[in-house]
Amino acid sequence: MNGGGVFTDILAASGRIFEVMVEGHWATVGYLFDSLGKGVSRINQNAYGNM
């Protein structure tokens, strides 16, 4: 699975969620939400194009 895309983003997010559970670093939570926001905007752009 190369070239990025939604599935890669989901795997990366899952890895970060697991990291939060294990380590308990709140900075990682902030990073996760930042990454999630970028992923959602990318999905919206792919779905609806540049509006």
Swiss-Prot record:
Q: Where in the cell is it found?
A: Chlorosome, Chlorosome envelope
Task: Return the Pfam families for the record.
Answer: Bac_chlorC
Q: Which residues bind a bacteriochlorophyll e?
A: H25
A Gene Ontology molecular function term for this protein is: bacteriochlorophyll binding
Q: Which UniProt keywords apply?
A: Bacteriochlorophyll, Chlorophyll, Chlorosome, Chromophore, Electron transport, Magnesium, Metal-binding, Photosynthesis, Transport
InterPro entries from the UniProt entry = Bchl_c-bd, Bchl_C-bd_sf
**Cellular component per GO, a single term:** chlorosome envelope
The GO biological-process annotations, alphabetized, read as: photosynthesis
**Family per UniProt?**
Belongs to the BChl C/E-binding protein family.
What this chain does, per the entry, is described as: Component of the photosynthetic apparatus. The light harvesting B740 complex binds bacteriochlorophyll e.
The molecule here is called Bacteriochlorophyll e-binding protein
Where is the organism placed in the taxonomic lineage, from the top?
Answer: Bacteria, Pseudomonadati, Chlorobiota, Chlorobiia, Chlorobiales
